[in-house]
Amino acid sequence: MAVKIRLRRMGAKKAPFYRIVVADSRSPRDGRFIEEIGYYDPLKKPAVINVNAERALDWLKKGAQLSDTAKALLTKAGVLKKTAGEGQ
């Protein structure tokens, strides 16, 4: 089972809110997921990114792949800097 960390769109029309989830890569964007590890609200100024870093790092160690957007958000939240520091 290929697992990805990606965004799941929530909210109303023209008012998106995203949950950062771990899901099987074959499931639809807003479909079934394994675990919710955070959220992203782009409408707030500044945009709010809240991620459970411990769970995200745990899934990355298990081999989960990041979508491009999830990678950018985790980098901005400082989660991926923690993985780079662990390798040293």
UniProtKB/Swiss-Prot annotation:
GO-annotated cellular components: cytoplasm; small ribosomal subunit
Keywords: Ribonucleoprotein, Ribosomal protein
GO molecular function: structural constituent of ribosome
KW NADP (keyword) present: no
Keyword Nuclease: no
InterPro entries per UniProt: Ribosomal_bS16, Ribosomal_bS16_dom_sf
GO biological process: translation
One Pfam short name: Ribosomal_S16
SUPFAM superfamilies: Ribosomal protein S16
Protein family (similarity comment): Belongs to the bacterial ribosomal protein bS16 family.
PANTHER family: 30S RIBOSOMAL PROTEIN S16, SMALL RIBOSOMAL SUBUNIT PROTEIN BS16M
Protein name: Small ribosomal subunit protein bS16
Species lineage: Bacteria, Bacillati, Bacillota, Clostridia, Eubacteriales
